[in-house]
Amino acid sequence: MAILPLSISHSLTSALSATSSGIGRPVARLLHPRVPSRPTVICLAAPPKVPVPIASPASLGDDPSKWDPAECDALLRGGEQVASVLQEMLKLMEDMEMDGSFESLAVELIAQGVIGKRVDEMESGFLMALDYMIQLAEKDSDNERKSLLEVVKQTVLDHLTKKCPPHVQVVGLLCQTEKKDSRHELLRRVAAGGGVFKNDKGLKCQIPGANLNDIANQADDLLESMESRPTIPDRKLLARLVIVREEARNMMGGGLLDERNDRGFTTLPEAEVNFLSKLVALKPGKALERMIKDVMQGKAEGADNIENANAGPDSKLNHLTGISGRGSVTGLKPRPVRPGMFLETVSKVLGGIYANNTSGITAQHLEWVHQTTLKILQEMAF
């Protein structure tokens, strides 16, 4: 007679009931207004400088009347697949005899088997539905159900990561590595051709070999994709990606004038230049550090422009002043100051100063701004 641990059986049954009870409901009842932002992973074996396969789509929002019907439909279809996966896991576990001490390992192995044969057929809303169910488990204070669903989610992400190009896998690993020294060691191993790497938690993993320039470009592409949105749903991920890009570029050894880091800008972004001109006018110190920190956290000049999130590209600038109090050069409303673009602007200005051999107090000031910004982002990221 098969023996199924009560706790796991209860968790699976609870998760299934939570899914099946929601799938048949109207969309407005199925979806809670507080749907969390959910990571989407789409891995394409493509050369660098393409849309990066790691992103966090914006939340559906708090107003059900404004939800995108396509996303609602994707959530429903994803929920059906989650229910199917959990049902198959429950069936397999009922046929097994497990010792209590091996429950967690058994769940992981079963999840690997069930998801491994389904990962290529998963709907785009699968991870979205998983995140919604994890949120429901948190709301119900059901830690066992939450842990089970998180195992399923992590297994899906692991399978998708393996299908990514090497430099994409490395970006994901770097975003999960908290210690700066560990990230540098990981980059050195990757540049040397890959091998076994021991992470912050003491676990060993096999890492692929990849080009540092590809890694920096991939992180930069993702930053560009995230920062081009009216709102930033995940500033922690954004901060991690900025750090990954800057550390990969720094390890390449080309310096500020390295042509490999050139995005091809003909002009610098207006919002970032306006903010930088304010910083240069003040002495380095705690007050200046607070200004930078506020903007990096999405306050002051870095605040998301929620009111005009849906405004067209021709929205005019009413009262915004340009550099040194002059009117805006373009006449268009600039985006908020974004961390990745801000550091890019600082680097370009510094590069111009060094190229013209005019380094002095301004260059030292900008170097301080660059290092202080990286320190603040490190604190935000982990």
UniProtKB/Swiss-Prot annotation:
Statement: the UniProt record of this protein carries the keyword Plastid: yes
One Gene Ontology cellular component annotation held by this UniProt entry: chloroplast nucleoid
Keyword terms: Chloroplast, Plastid, Transit peptide
GO biological process, one term: regulation of DNA-templated transcription
Major localization listed first in the record, in broad terms: plastid
Localization terms from the record: Plastid, Chloroplast stroma, Chloroplast nucleoid
Top-rank taxon: Eukaryota
Keyword Chloroplast on entry: yes
InterPro entries (UniProt xref): PRDA1
Job of this protein: Plays an essential role in early steps of chloroplast development. May be involved in the redox control of plastid gene expression by maintening the redox state around chloroplast nucleoids. May positively regulate plastid-encoded RNA polymerase (PEP) activity.
Name by which UniProt lists this protein: Protein PEP-RELATED DEVELOPMENT ARRESTED 1 homolog, chloroplastic
Organism: Oryza sativa subsp. japonica
